[in-house]
């Protein structure tokens, strides 16, 4: 099986990106959305990305998108321009193939060229695999927001993991 290639997402990838995101919702581990989102709703989110400073990357094997990573501005104020939140999602049938690790590793390598000095990851406190992934790259817990999310009546903590990259 060919190794997927990393590239900037194009608009034609958006349905696959949304499908991967929606596949994470029922597990209540990776997103605070409780219902599937529509492609049309995510179009403005897609348009906020740009390859020069806030890319949206996909890992593609031919026409199949197996995983994606997003850089998003933190807090939307100019003083935070050198800080970005990264989010990574992998299609369920491609979990445990190292794709999230590959994407996070690339984000760390390329962040300085994007003008970034700090990367953040917002992760539920019960999402042990994601916490381990980011800690494996040297991210530290910078904040714990206790019981801020209610997922099916269960209150969950939100951790903010951070790493200086430049």
Where are these regions (language model features)?
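Conserved GNAT acetyl-CoA-binding A-motif
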Residues: 111-123
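Conserved catalytic-core motifs of GNAT/GCN5-like acyltransferases
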Residues: 70-73, 78, 120-123, 140-157
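Acetyl-CoA-dependent GNAT
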Residues: 8, 35-93, 104-105, 164-165
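Conserved acetyl-CoA-binding loop-helix of GNAT-fold acetyltransferases
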Residues: 96-109, 132-136
């Amino acid at each position: 099986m060919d190794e997927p290639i990393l590239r900037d997402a194009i608009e034609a990838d958006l349905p696959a990106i949304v499908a991967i995101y929606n596949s994470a919702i029922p597990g209540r581990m990776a997103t605070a959305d409780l219902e599937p989102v529509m492609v049309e709703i995510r179009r403005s989110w897609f348009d906020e990305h740009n390859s020069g400073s806030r890319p949206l990357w996909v890992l593609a094997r031919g026409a199949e998108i197996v995983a994606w990573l997003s850089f998003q501005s933190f807090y939307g104020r100019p003083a935070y321009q050198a800080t970005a939140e990264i989010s990574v999602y992998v299609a369920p049938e491609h979990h445990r193939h190292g794709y999230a690790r590959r994407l996070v590793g690339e984000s760390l390598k390329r962040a300085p060229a994007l003008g970034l000095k700090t990367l953040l990851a917002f992760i539920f406190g019960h999402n042990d695999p994601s916490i381990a992934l980011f800690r494996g790259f040297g991210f530290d817990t910078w904040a714990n927001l206790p019981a801020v999310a209610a997922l099916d009546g269960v209150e969950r903590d939100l951790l903010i993991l951070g790493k200086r990259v430049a």
